[in-house]
């Protein structure tokens, strides 16, 4: 009898420990047929692509209840390509963080979305992916160089506050950790944050960030200010973004760009959603401007599976060479002043 009681106590203790911890395997497989009418050489491109409605991914995440409202967690997530498998070189560059959360909010350490991108890309109706999302967080203008930290950053420390009656904020700092002799100083460094108000149908956010990128081997400041807002009327949702980016260069002068986005989405029959979004990208110093219109529809077959279609049109003016992003098929620009049209039809499954 005594041995039985001891055995039951051990089982109960182990069950409680298991209940306090969890590990989840998750992912999305998103594959589509895509067509782009024109590349930089004037030729059309078509084929099987990936990440049209959501970025295809595979990951592990877990939490441990430490008691007193404190939780530890980890998140490892990498991109996958449903069109060709792309098994070689898999990594966790979408996110690789360890965290602590509680009544004070959440602290994360590791590679992650920078706070400004994490919050403000939520106003993009196409979730910063597919053939025609808002491209303001990328270095789209001539002379801006490589986009190091506009969306994600290595060596990032970030903090997200709890919600205070609708008000919330997030802040982050990424170390540059220069390790290679001869590289530009401070490249990779990020400092920025946002303040937001989310209450019922209304959401509004203001983000400020400075990143160190590299142009011609020289470190360059990328100063970014972004304002985003949305309002859900029930029958439709309106969303908008205003962004100004300034590159401070030692050689060649500063580059100033403005990006604007306005979109609307509406539910269809309880199982679908139609989306229409317009964006303008303007670099006045060299008379470079591009207009972008994207139309999309998502039809949910279940909570985890959906069919979708995207149609995008991009019109460059003057010196602009922007291009649509049909991942797995074509992701490049066109000749200056040329227009481009693209289509994606695909399926997305989450697990």
From Swiss-Prot:
Q: Which residues carry this modification: Pyrrolidone carboxylic acid?
A: 20
Job description of the protein: Forms anion selective channels.
Annotated coiled-coil segments of the chain = none
Q: Does the keyword ATP-binding apply?
A: no
> Can you provide one Gene Ontology molecular function annotated for this UniProt record?
porin activity
Q: Name one Pfam family in it.
A: Porin_4
Looking up SUPFAM superfamilies in the UniProt record yields: Porins
Query: Where is it mainly found?
Result: membrane
Family the UniProt entry places it in? To bacterial outer membrane proteins and porins.
Gene label = omp32
Give the way it sits in the membrane: Multi-pass membrane protein
Signal peptide coordinates: 1-19
Assembly state and interactors? Homotrimer.
Q: Which organism is it from?
A: Delftia acidovorans
Keywords (alphabetical) are: Cell outer membrane, Ion transport, Membrane, Porin, Pyrrolidone carboxylic acid, Signal, Transmembrane, Transmembrane beta strand, Transport
| Record field: transmembrane | none
InterPro entries, alphabetized: Gram-neg_bact_OMP, Gram_neg_porin_domain, Porin_dom_sf, Porin_Neis
Query: Which Gene Ontology terms describe the biological processes this protein takes part in?
Result: monoatomic ion transport
What is the protein name for this chain?
Outer membrane porin protein 32
């Amino acid at each position: 009898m005594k041995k039985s009681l001891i055995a039951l106590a051990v089982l109960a203790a182990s069950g409680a420990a298991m209940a306090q911890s969890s590990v989840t395997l998750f992912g999305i497989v998103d594959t589509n047929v895509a067509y782009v009418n024109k590349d930089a050489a004037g030729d059309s491109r078509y084929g099987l692509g990936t990440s049209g409605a959501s970025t295809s991914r595979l990951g592990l995440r877990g939490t441990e209840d430490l008691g007193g409202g404190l939780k530890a967690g980890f998140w490892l997530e990498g991109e996958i390509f449903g069109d060709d498998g792309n098994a070689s070189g898999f990594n966790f560059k979408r996110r690789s963080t360890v965290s602590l959360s509680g009544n004070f909010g959440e602290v994360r350490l590791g590679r992650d979305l920078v706070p400004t991108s994490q919050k403000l890309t939520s106003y993009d109706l196409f979730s910063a992916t597919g053939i025609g999302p808002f491209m303001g967080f990328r270095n789209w203008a001539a002379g801006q160089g490589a986009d190091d930290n506009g969306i994600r950053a290595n060596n990032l420390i970030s903090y997200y506050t709890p919600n205070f009656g609708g008000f919330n904020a997030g802040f982050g700092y990424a170390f540059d950790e220069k390790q290679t002799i001869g590289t530009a100083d401070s490249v990779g460094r990020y400092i920025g944050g946002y303040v937001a108000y989310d209450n019922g149908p209304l959401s509004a956010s203001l983000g400020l960030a400075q990143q160190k990128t590299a142009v011609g081997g020289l470190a360059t400041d990328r100063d970014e200010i972004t304002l985003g807002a949305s309002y859900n009327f029930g029958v439709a949702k309106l969303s908008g973004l205003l962004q100004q980016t300034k590159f401070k260069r030692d050689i060649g002068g500063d580059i100033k760009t403005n990006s604007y986005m306005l979109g609307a989405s509406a539910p269809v029959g309880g199982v679908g959603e139609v989306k229409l979004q317009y964006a303008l990208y303007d670099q006045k110093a060299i008379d470079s401007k591009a207009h972008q219109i994207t139309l999309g529809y998502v039809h949910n077959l279940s909570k985890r599976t959906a069919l979708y279609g995207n149609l995008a049109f991009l019109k460059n003016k003057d010196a602009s060479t922007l291009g649509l992003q049909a991942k797995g098929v074509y992701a490049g620009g066109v000749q200056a002043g040329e227009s481009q049209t693209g289509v994606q039809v695909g399926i997305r499954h989450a697990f």
